[in-house]
């Protein structure tokens, strides 16, 4: 599973949420990003252990254009089997593309796919990942991309028992020491 460079909450949540879904289904799956994953998203990948296997499918999540993969993953761009995205600007570079431009986040598209195809029952960690992506890409549900479907997906994810208030505070209210220092100057 490939995510975009300069990772945000949606690409990290999509990548790890989908990875955990596939693993729960008995599939081998790993997440790759050209850039280091920000520590603020560590709660989504702290227990993640990469698996050793040769992939037969490559999925890109929240990657509208292969240029967004970054230099470390650019070599895989022409081999992407499936792209799951929500950007109307998607350039359809994958063999198959699932784009829902009315969705607030790729995580919303993935959750809809999980439900509609009855892939597996999400657990608390999967729900945490998917909710985080929806929350961050919707600006904590205040951006115009937020729809009734966005709220319904978030509500269904909340049923899995994670702490949404903590996630929203961490994503929108907490500042790193380095950011505080920059703002003080």
Regions found by a protein language model. Name each.
Residues 87-153:
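Short alpha-helices
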């Amino acid at each position: 599973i490939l995510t975009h460079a300069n990772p945000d909450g949606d690409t990290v949540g999509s990548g790890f949420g989908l990875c955990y879904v596939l693993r729960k289904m008995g599939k081998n799956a790993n997440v790759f990003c050209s850039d280091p994953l920000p520590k603020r998203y560590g709660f989504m990948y702290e227990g993640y252990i990469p698996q050793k296997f040769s992939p037969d499918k490559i999925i890109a999540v929240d990657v509208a254009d292969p240029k967004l993969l970054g230099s470390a993953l650019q070599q895989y761009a022409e081999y992407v089997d499936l792209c799951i995205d929500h950007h109307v600007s998607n350039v359809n570079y994958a063999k198959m593309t699932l784009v829902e431009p009315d969705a607030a986040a790729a995580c919303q598209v993935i959750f809809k796919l999980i439900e509609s195809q009855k892939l597996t029952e999400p657990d608390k960690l999967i729900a945490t990942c998917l909710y985080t992506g929806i929350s961050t890409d919707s600006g904590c549900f205040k951006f115009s991309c937020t729809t009734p479907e966005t709220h319904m997906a978030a509500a269904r994810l909340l049923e899995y028992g994670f702490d949404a208030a903590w996630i929203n505070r961490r994503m929108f209210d907490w500042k790193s020491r380095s950011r505080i220092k920059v703002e003080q100057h």
